[in-house]
UniProtKB/Swiss-Prot annotation:
Its main location: secreted. InterPro entries: Calcitonin, Calcitonin/adrenomedullin, Calcitonin_CS, Calcitonin_peptide-like. Causes a rapid but short-lived drop in the level of calcium and phosphate in blood by promoting the incorporation of those ions in the bones. This is Calcitonin-3. GO terms for molecular function: hormone activity. Calcitonin 1 is less active than calcitonins 1 or 2. Only this species of salmon possesses calcitonin 3. It comes from Oncorhynchus kisutch. Keywords: Amidation, Disulfide bond, Hormone, Secreted. Disulfide bonds join 1-7. The modification Proline amide is found at residue 32. PROSITE patterns: CALCITONIN (PS00258). Belongs to the calcitonin family.
Length: 32
């Protein structure tokens, strides 16, 4: 990655998107 901040932000957003799309089975009220 060229920019660490941008790369981390992208990874974070991707992870958040995955968490939001996945069914809430293991994560109770962890995701808003």
């Amino acid at each position: 990655c060229s920019n660490l901040s941008t790369c981390m932000l992208g990874k974070l957003s991707q992870d958040l998107h995955k968490l939001q799309t996945f069914p809430r089975t293991n994560t109770g009220a962890g995701v808003p």
